């Protein structure tokens, strides 16, 4: 039986656990590893968001900065993250003002067209988080676990919005040189507990927090699968759980042929298999690029966990 939670977003709440909620990924970036920037223009982004809602998305996650390999985060080049492109060239960092220019028009337009839509903003910057919530978003999804911007925890507490706390091991520029870990699952579980405790101490109410173990972020092929295999044990932390595995490199590696990882375009079935497994292991929210396929898989998997 999957745990049931009420996720407090401020003006309303979402029931988590009765059925799997689908978070559709909307990258408003020119260099996303998954879609190549095809939704970079605000009108295109809003149109695609509406399409995802029609396909069954419960939440639209709007992001204005790429975390693909070679993207630069906080002025540092990421290496070997999601798409498995080990030697991608570093990109110019996205400024705060540019990130705002990317996400705010999309959030405002989407909220105007679909006022009932639940929107999250994928950012590690507190000023972007505040502006996005004021524009109509209700959730802050922070890949840094509220750690990179010292004002983020205080900002989320003041905004009284929903929040996703994701685990990332080290910083992107450190990923190639991280020391070996004997038990990646226990490391992630321990740090998620510590970071969630720090968030509540800073004033973020417990019922506003969802945890994400951060598949692919500072974890290699051999380290991601234990997180999937033991995912249900994260419920011992007593928070609702979100998982995002869509199109990631550890899926491409598992689908390798003739010594070559499956390309991003060839990871659909592997993605859906991993997402269904996560639902069966208790994930309340799945973050995905494949909304229709994930929704259908989750509907069937939900029956097994009820």
Spans of model-derived segments:
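Conserved, well-structured ligand/cofactor-binding cores
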Residues: 22, 27, 32, 61, ...
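N-terminal glycine-rich anion-binding loops that anchor highly charged ligand groups
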Residues: 16-25, 51-64
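Hydrophobic "anchor" residues on beta-strands that sit immediately upstream
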Residues: 23, 57, 118, 138, ...
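Active-site-adjacent loop and "lid" segments of alpha/beta metabolic enzymes
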Residues: 2, 9-10, 34-51, 67-80, ...
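Phosphate/pyrophosphate-binding loops at sites that engage ATP/ADP/AMP, CoA/4′-phosphopantetheine
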Residues: 54, 58, 195-208
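SAM-dependent methyltransferases
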Residues: 1-19
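N-terminal binding-site loop/beta-alpha segment at the start of enzyme catalytic domains
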Residues: 15-43
């Amino acid at each position: 039986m999957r745990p049931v939670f009420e996720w407090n977003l401020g003006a309303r709440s979402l029931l988590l656990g009765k059925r799997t909620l689908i978070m559709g990924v909307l990258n408003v970036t020119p260099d996303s590893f998954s879609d190549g920037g095809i939704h970079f223009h605000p009108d295109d982004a809003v149109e695609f968001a509406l399409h995802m809602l029609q396909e069954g998305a419960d939440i639209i996650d709007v992001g204005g900065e790429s975390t693909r390999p070679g993207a630069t985060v906080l002025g540092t080049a990421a290496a070997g993250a999601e798409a498995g492109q080990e030697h991608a060239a570093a990109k110019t960092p996205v400024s705060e003002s540019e990130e705002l220019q990317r996400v705010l028009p999309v959030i405002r337009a989407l909220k105007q067209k679909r006022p009932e839509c639940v929107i999250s903003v994928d950012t590690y910057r507190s000023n972007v988080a505040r502006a996005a919530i004021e524009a109509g978003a209700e959730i802050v999804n922070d890949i840094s676990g509220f750690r990179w911007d010292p004002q983020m925890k205080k900002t989320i507490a003041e905004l009284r919005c929903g929040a996703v706390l994701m685990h990332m091991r080290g910083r992107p520029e450190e990923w190639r040189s991280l020391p070996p870990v004997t038990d990646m699952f226990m490391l992630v579980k321990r740090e998620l507990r510590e970071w969630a405790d720090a968030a509540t101490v800073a004033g973020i109410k417990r019922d506003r927090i969802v945890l994400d173990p951060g598949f692919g972020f500072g974890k290699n092929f051999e380290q991601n699968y234990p997180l999937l295999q033991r995912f249900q044990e994260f419920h011992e932390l007593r928070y609702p759980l979100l998982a995002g595995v869509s199109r990631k490199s550890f899926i491409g590696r598992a689908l390798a042929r003739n010594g070559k990882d499956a390309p991003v375009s060839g990871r659909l079935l592997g993605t859906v298999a991993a997402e269904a497994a996560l639902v069966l292991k208790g994930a309340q929210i799945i973050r995905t690029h494949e909304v229709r396929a994930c929704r259908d898989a989750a509907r069937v998997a939900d029956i097994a966990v009820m």
